[in-house]
Regions:
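Compositionally biased terminal segments of proteins
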Residues: 1-156
């Protein structure tokens, strides 16, 4: 799965149109930063504030997610709070990462980088140094490999 996938582009367009504060994390973020590996889902870290919940729900409604209203109160837990796009691709929604927690979201959001995935759609991606630190804290071997490969690419 890649960013050329129409449903992924449509999903990010809905997030951006509704001014949702999110960061792309996980395998797609690793790919954007230059280490290409396969990934089975799209991981997004959301600002879990009252002010961000309504735009997020509006984005889901615009995209066509049934039951989107539940996201007004549903906890954003990695591996638990998932959305299935129209193509069956899974979006994993989280309020906390392994290392970085919600209280650090705004700081991470401020230093994040925007990348164009099409001429008119951008995604906000966890900064490379933040992503490496996050991946280093994981217990999963593939995340450790991601961190090492990203360090090599950026000669950190």
């Amino acid at each position: 799965m890649d960013f050329a996938e129409v449903e992924i582009i449509k999903f990010f367009k809905c997030l951006n149109t509704n001014h949702v504060k999110y960061l792309l994390v996980g395998g797609f973020a690793v790919n954007i930063h230059g280490f290409n590996r396969s990934t089975s889902d799209l991981d997004i870290w959301l600002d879990d504030s009252v002010e961000n919940r309504t735009p997020f729900v509006n984005a889901l409604l615009e995209y066509g997610i049934e039951g989107a209203e539940l996201f007004h109160t549903l906890p954003f837990i990695a591996g638990y709070t998932e959305i299935s796009l129209n193509n069956g691709f899974c979006v994993d929604v989280m309020a906390d990462l392994q290392f970085f927690k919600q209280r650090e979201f705004n700081e991470c959001y401020t230093i994040a980088k925007e990348f164009n995935i099409t001429n008119d759609v951008t995604v906000r991606v966890l900064h490379i140094n933040t992503l490496i630190k996050e991946k280093e804290q994981s217990l999963r071997p593939k995340d450790k490999i991601d961190a090492e490969q990203l360090k090599k690419l950026y000669k950190k």
